[in-house]
UniProtKB/Swiss-Prot annotation:
List of catalytic residues: S525 (proton acceptor)
Subunit structure: Homodimer.
GO cellular component, one term: cytosol
Organism classification: Bacteria, Pseudomonadati, Pseudomonadota, Gammaproteobacteria, Alteromonadales
Species annotation: Shewanella baltica (strain OS185)
Protein name: Dihydroxy-acid dehydratase
Gene behind the chain: ilvD
UniProt pathway: Amino-acid biosynthesis; L-isoleucine biosynthesis; L-isoleucine from 2-oxobutanoate: step 3/4; Amino-acid biosynthesis; L-valine biosynthesis; L-valine from pyruvate: step 3/4
Pfam families, alphabetized: ILV_EDD_C, ILVD_EDD_N
């Protein structure tokens, strides 16, 4: 029988000092011997997705203590990618994922916690906590802050739905008046919560449901809705049930590595492809798989992308639907139900929401779908749950409204979620391309690519940084038919693998959204759409071919054939490579780029791998 980890610091005379300190935190005599549950919160006033999380730890703690545990809360950092975007702050976003993972590991292991509840929400916080949870392999439940309501405003007497990307595009579009731009800006992000489309934060929170580590509704229930309160309380109850199963019954199926196994990672990627999730999810799933010792690679993603249809289309891929609409259609469980009926899902995997013979968290995804898939459930409470809707009232407060849609969206032919027969497309929303530009692959969010752009041939317009590319786009240097190449923005070369939302937004605002392509060894915001190809691996700083592209080179992109090719002979490429090597210490470095890189970022860059490995640390440099 596994012994409580916390016994290390609570049992025996030699731990009298530790017990004295525990007592100073509020632990009583009769508490010693109970499991200590760490609550990793991420409250901050910097981030709308986290501004409402201050009291969520106390809510979870109340359920833990009622179930017989000791709850101890701590906080991690949280970077807002939207606020950090477009300047040097974006260099810190992806590296913050590793810091979050490490900080959770440090706190949990330093204090010998027995189990963990992760309260996350935005772009790098959920992935960082996921990496830590799988690294630690102690009972865990995830519960996020939830998505914000979609913005709404009237323009030219027409009511339109908005999100963050609309504000960015309007701000850069000279055809939009100052008055309309300001109106869009003020309406785009009306409430607390993660940005309202299928951007990175919401994509990752949805994927925790598919991995089996969070409760139904986690990825789609609005941050403002009163029903979300129960998710926090149930997370506390569930983690205690998992802890008791593991420590009292020696049931290893309660551990995250046995829940989030290879099949669960396939389920998560299947969901991601079907819902056209952010391309960043590829990066984070690859990183999480390594922490779980699961052999899940780009090859698996490529294989699955050819099999899974696109069943759910959400902003930024369409202005019609946002996360509140996904929830109305049944949320993640609604999409998984359609995937199951299409024969594309493993339903024999464990799930924290599944009960078996009255034992919480001991059943499989099959039983979760039977209860929570709105197309098959007979539970009226579940249907009521998925009818939770927006109030349309600006607020930073959680659980501030209890509005309901008049009905569920069960239209699987023309609704937000489709059946396989009526899919938006029979190939999914993400694809892996490869070729001499990206020998180890690159990623495109096909859900956001217009059909006319599925194949594209153009001339390279090369930039050594995102800043230079933005200047080139806004300055009129980029013209129709160009393939904008932004390099040395990968994990090592940036460092930090910046998001390229501003270049893609500015291409749209200049009327070039369908007339140009963009490729980069950096990454894209979940808010990106258009022919935007990121994660080029190997990156330029690691000797990738993207570093050898020259202005005017012909680049051929063929998404149906999963191909990206630089139309330059091998002889010429070898000559360019030799020339690069001849530069010695200056080889594989950007030409003329002026950028301050702090010591902290240099430390990250020293160990960073390319995107095809999840941009995680190169373990070979750390092992003896």
């Amino acid at each position: 029988m596994p012994k409580l980890r916390s016994a290390t610091s609570t049992e025996g005379r030699n731990m009298a000092g530790a017990r004295a300190l525990w007592r100073a935190t509020g632990v009583k005599d009769n508490d010693f011997g109970k499991p200590i549950i760490a609550i990793a919160n991420s409250f901050t006033q910097f981030v709308p997705g986290h501004v409402h999380l201050k009291d969520m730890g106390s809510l979870v703690a109340s359920a833990i203590e009622e179930a017989g545990g000791i709850a101890k809360e701590f906080n991690t950092i949280a970077v807002d990618d939207g606020i950090a975007m477009g300047h040097g702050g974006m260099l810190y976003s992806l590296p913050s994922r590793e810091l979050i993972a490490d900080s959770v590991e440090y706190m949990v292991n330093a204090h010998c916690a027995d189990a963990l509840v992760c309260i996350s929400n935005c772009d790098k916080i959920t992935p960082g906590m996921l990496m830590a949870a799988l690294r630690l392999n102690i009972p865990v439940v995830f519960v996020s802050g939830g998505p914000m309501e979609a913005g709404k405003t009237k323009l030219s007497d027409k009511l339109i739905k908005l999100d963050l990307v609309d504000a960015m595009v309007a701000g850069a579009d000279s055809n939009v008046s100052d008055e309309d731009s300001a109106k869009i800006e003020r309406s785009a992000c009306p409430t607390c919560g993660s940005c309202s489309g299928m951007f990175t934060a919401n994509s990752m929170n949805c994927l925790t449901e598919a991995l089996g580590l969070s409760l139904p509704g986690n990825g789609s229930m609005l941050a403002t809705h009163a029903d979300r309160r129960e998710l926090f309380l149930e997370a506390g109850r569930r983690v205690m049930a998992l802890a008791k199963r593991y420590y009292h019954q020696d049931d290893e199926s309660a551990l995250p590595r046995n829940i989030a196994n290879f099949k669960a990672f396939e389920n998560a990627m299947t969901l991601d492809i079907a819902m056209g999730g952010s391309s960043n999810t590829v990066l984070h799933l690859l990183a999480a798989a390594q922490e779980a010792d699961v052999d899940f690679t780009m090859a698996d993603i490529d294989r699955m992308s050819r099999l899974v249809p696109h069943l759910c289309k959400v902003a930024p891929s369409t202005p019609k639907y946002h996360m509140e609409d996904v929830h109305r259609a049944g949320g993640v469980m609604g999409i998984l139900g359609e995937l199951d009926r299409a024969g594309l899902l493993h339903t024999d995997v464990f799930h924290v929401a599944a009960d078996n013979d009255g034992t919480p968290g001991s059943g499989t995804l099959k039983s979760v779908l039977a209860q929570y898939d709105v197309m098959q459930t007979q539970d009226e409470k579940v249907k009521h749950f998925f009818m939770a809707g927006p109030a349309g009232i600006p607020t930073t407060k959680a659980f501030s409204q209890d509005c309901r849609w008049p009905s569920l969206d069960n239209d699987r032919q023309e609704g937000c979620i489709r059946s396989r027969e009526f899919a938006f497309s029979q190939e999914g929303g993400l694809a892996v391309l490869s070729g001499n530009v990206a020998e180890n692959g690159c990623i495109v969010k096909t859900a956001g690519v217009d059909e006319s752009n599925l194949t594209f041939i153009g001339s390279a317009r090369v930039y050594e940084s995102q800043d230079d590319a933005v200047a080139g786009i806004l300055g009129g240097e980029v013209v129709a038919g160009d393939v904008v190449v932004i390099r040395y923005e990968g994990p090592k070369g940036g460092p930090g693998m910046q998001e390229m939302l501003y270049p893609t937004s500015y291409l749209k605002s200049r009327g070039l959204g369908k007339a140009c392509a963009l490729i980069t060894d950096g990454r894209f915001s979940g808010g990106t759409s258009g022919l935007s190809i990121g994660h080029v691996s190997p990156e330029a700083a690691a000797g990738g071919t993207i570093a050898l592209i020259e202005n005017g080179d012909r680049i051929e992109i063929d998404i149906p054939k999963r191909s990206i090719k630089l139309a330059v002979s091998d002889v010429e490429l070898n000559a360019r490579r030799e020339k690069m090597h001849s530069l010695g210490p200056m080889a594989w470095k950007p030409i003329g780029r002026q950028r301050y890189v702090s010591l902290a970022l240099k430390a990250y860059a020293m160990l960073a791998t390319s995107a095809d490995k999840g941009a995680v640390r190169d373990r070979s440099k750390l092992e003896d």
